[in-house]
């Protein structure tokens, strides 16, 4: 099975070990645009770099993992690319990067990305994953003042809930954050969501 058409220009590679994977990363030129990395499924019995090893290697060399797709009966594909100049950091990757530094594994390219993120504020502004995200106090207060919005927020699926929390967190200025909170509370009070429900499902309708 071929990789997704949207990124079919990237090479598809597999590596038997984390050492092979990191050696490949270290040899990549600055002009590299990324790779579709093949990760063998556990039941395949094929020697392969694991997903965590793939992520660790990417972080150490200033790269980042992304989309995951099915490849065939034995492999998954994960898209791994150099981190973009203003690419956001997740709290999970930030914490893992600190572990890799303590272990002495972080490479120069990876440290440069960390230093850049610290200088421009992206390191401090790292976002929580969907499973770890919490409702901030200012959003909670706004919801509490609007019972209809609060009720509909509590009924959101995890995708729509995280969509709001992420966008509020991602606001760069206090006034932008306040505007977003106001907009989402108004949206919720009308029973609307950021991501409409799939037509293939019949979810419970949000009510005012």
What spans do the regions from the language model cover?
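Charge-dense, helix-prone N-terminal extensions
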Residues: 1-208
